[in-house]
Every structure is written in C-alpha cells, then in structure tokens.
C-alpha cells in the first residue's frame, strides 16, 4: 500500500482521535434526493451522537449509472467498506460520531486504466493503476473533491477534515492515499479479491482510509 503527500506536504503528527471526536457534538438528516441523477447524495451511515459529525464521503470510479441502483454493485462495495472500517478500533468505539455519505458518479465504462496499457478506460475520475506487482493508483483529485463537496455539509473548509474514498470498479490488490498539506485526503481503493488478511478488500479500506487518510499514519515497511 502507498501513502503519498501532495503539495510537498510534510508528515504530520497523528491527529488525536479522541480529541477530534469530542469536537463532534449534532447530526443532520438525510436530504431529499433524486436517485436518477449523477451526483446524488445518500446517507449510508448517520451519526447518532454529537452536534457536528465526523464526515467520510465515498464515491466510485468505473461504475455505470445502473451500478448505482439501490443495492447494486456500488452499494455493495460501499457497504463492505463501511462495515470493514467500523469493525476495528477506534472507529468501532466512536462509530456513533461518524456520518458516511455516498455520492453517485457515473462512468461511461466499467473498470480502470492500467498505466502502460495502449487503451484507456473511460471513467469519471480517470483512475489509473500502476499494474504488475505495484499497488499504486491515481486519479483526478480535483474532480473527486468537486464531487465530495456535493455531500451534505461538505464545504471547502469541511473538506479539509473529511476523508474521501474512491472505490475503483476493478479487481486488483491495490490502494493509494493522497494527503494534502491543507488536510484534504483521498483514498483510492480497488476491489481486491484477495482472501488473506493483508490483501482482502476490507483490510485495504482500513489501511488506506483509516490509517493513512484519517489517522495520517505512514507505512512502517
């Protein structure tokens, strides 16, 4: 797994998780949405404690419009990611303080682009995998942030305290998190089919979104 810093960002000390949670003290309600529109926001997990939720936004790349149907391919992947993240500490204990929203982002084609491939897959965020034995991934960060700001309460300021997860509709053990010096972060995660503790999809979510994106932890290997 990889953790890269944008804008010449220096490694920060880890934000005290409990301190961040204490700052989170009322939670809003799910706004009315049009399920047939690109950029639709859904509340996948609402906070039940506090005035201000700790926000996570999940969107997808390489998913067609039909894949965003309720209970469809994207929902299944997003729910799996949410279940994995909140099954481990400290997210498990402080789960009530978190709000998780999903944002639909329609791609023209399923899948992702491999870095050295002769053809590119036409996806909304242009996610590209390094391929081979590398777990590296990248995408159009600015466009991802634009979609994340469609979510309830996610202003430009709040985005700096929000973890954004992009699930790539491509089966490979891969994931990379980009952390910016202003606090923003994006975790790109592919749909790993691995069965080992290291390579399974849920572990990649915890590692990238939880460890790198939220905790600002660096790899130790």
Task: List each model region and its residues.
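C-terminal motif of bacterial Sec signal peptides marking the signal peptidase cleavage site
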Residues: 23-26
């Amino acid at each position: 797994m990889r953790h890269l810093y944008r804008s010449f960002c220096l490694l920060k000390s880890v934000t005290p998780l409990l301190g961040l949670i204490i700052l989170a003290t009322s939670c809003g309600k799910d706004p009315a949405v049009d399920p047939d529109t690109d950029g639709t926001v859904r509340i996948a997990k609402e906070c039940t404690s506090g005035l201000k939720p700790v926000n996570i936004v999940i969107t997808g790349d390489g998913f067609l419009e039909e894949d965003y149907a309720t209970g469809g391919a994207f929902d299944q992947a997003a729910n799996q990611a949410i279940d994995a993240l909140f099954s481990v500490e400290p997210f498990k204990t402080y789960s009530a303080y978190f709000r998780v929203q999903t944002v639909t982002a329609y791609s023209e084609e399923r899948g992702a682009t491999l870095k050295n491939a002769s053809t590119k897959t036409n996806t909304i965020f242009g996610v590209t995998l390094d391929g081979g034995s590398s777990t590296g991934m990248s995408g159009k960060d600015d466009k991802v942030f634009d979609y994340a700001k469609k979510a309830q309460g996610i202003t430009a300021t709040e985005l700096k305290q929000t973890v954004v997860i992009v699930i790539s509709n491509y089966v490979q053990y891969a994931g990379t998190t980009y952390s910016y010096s202003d606090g923003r972060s994006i975790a790109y995660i592919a749909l790993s089919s691995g069965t080992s503790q290291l390579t399974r999809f849920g572990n990649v979510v915890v590692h990238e979104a939880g460890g790198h994106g939220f905790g600002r932890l660096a790899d130790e290997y």
